[in-house]
């Protein structure tokens, strides 16, 4: 297992950037929407985009239970398959942050059921892979990780997650190719270089691995400094 929920994998929902998360309280800023009484509001009166925004804001301030509720509500009212799939994917990610793997699996499968070949299919597959991996379903996780990059070859976190699983499975040559793809597509975090070092070590390319691991260490230190500065 992993010591932290997202160690190894990268499964961030899209567009979770808020300049000052501590200053945002979705309950205050979206009170009418968030306190919606489902029994008294017709579906065509619900702003699904706004509900998605509520969930994203909750995610940004680590209120994942509230985020999951907002995303579920958005999914229930969405009349567009793409919006509904987005809501289910984000709900699954929120459950993943809470380490609620069964709920995460269900949400991502629902996203694929709604729109199996749509815009969010690759994200659903790669997030489903993570949740299944955490449940110990290694083979299913690997299959969905492959499906993610098959659906969207330009999804950097999809390549990273597949590479991570391949390192764990001892498929070091394939893993190296996936991790290099992730880097080329802009995935610039210490974790991808750490996994690349592991893949190189598995291929007995130890000198290269040491150089890559040094890069990973430098990036990790920079990430930690940015985290401290943001607090």
Predicted regions located by residue number:
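TPR-adjacent "capping" and linker segments in tetratricopeptide-repeat scaffold/adaptor proteins
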Residues: 32-50, 78-81, 115-119
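Conserved alpha-helical positions within TPR/SEL1-like repeat arrays
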Residues: 52-60, 85-97, 120-133, 157-164, ...
């Amino acid at each position: 297992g992993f010591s932290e929920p997202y160690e190894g994998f990268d499964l961030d929902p899209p567009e979770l950037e808020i300049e000052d998360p501590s200053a945002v309280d979705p309950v205050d800023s979206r009170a009418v929407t968030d306190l919606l009484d489902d029994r008294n509001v017709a579906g065509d009166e619900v702003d699904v985009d706004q509900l998605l925004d509520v969930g994203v804001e909750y995610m940004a301030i680590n209120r994942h239970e509230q985020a999951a509720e907002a995303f579920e509500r958005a999914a229930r009212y969405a009349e567009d398959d793409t919006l509904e799939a987005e809501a289910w994917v984000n709900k699954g990610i929120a459950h993943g942050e809470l380490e609620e793997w069964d709920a995460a699996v269900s949400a991502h499968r629902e996203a694929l059921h709604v729109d199996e070949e749509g815009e969010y299919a690759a994200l659903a597959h790669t997030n489903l892979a993570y949740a299944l991996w955490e449940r110990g379903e290694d083979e299913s996780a690997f299959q969905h990780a492959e499906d993610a990059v098959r659906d969207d070859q330009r999804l950097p976190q999809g390549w990273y997650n597949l590479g991570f699983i391949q390192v764990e499975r001892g498929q070091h040559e394939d893993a190296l190719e996936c991790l290099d793809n992730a880097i080329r597509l802009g995935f610039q975090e210490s974790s991808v270089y750490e996994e690349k070092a592991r893949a190189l070590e598995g291929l007995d390319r130890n000198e290269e691995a040491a150089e890559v691991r040094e890069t990973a260490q430098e990036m990790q230190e920079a990430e930690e400094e940015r985290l401290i500065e943001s607090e």
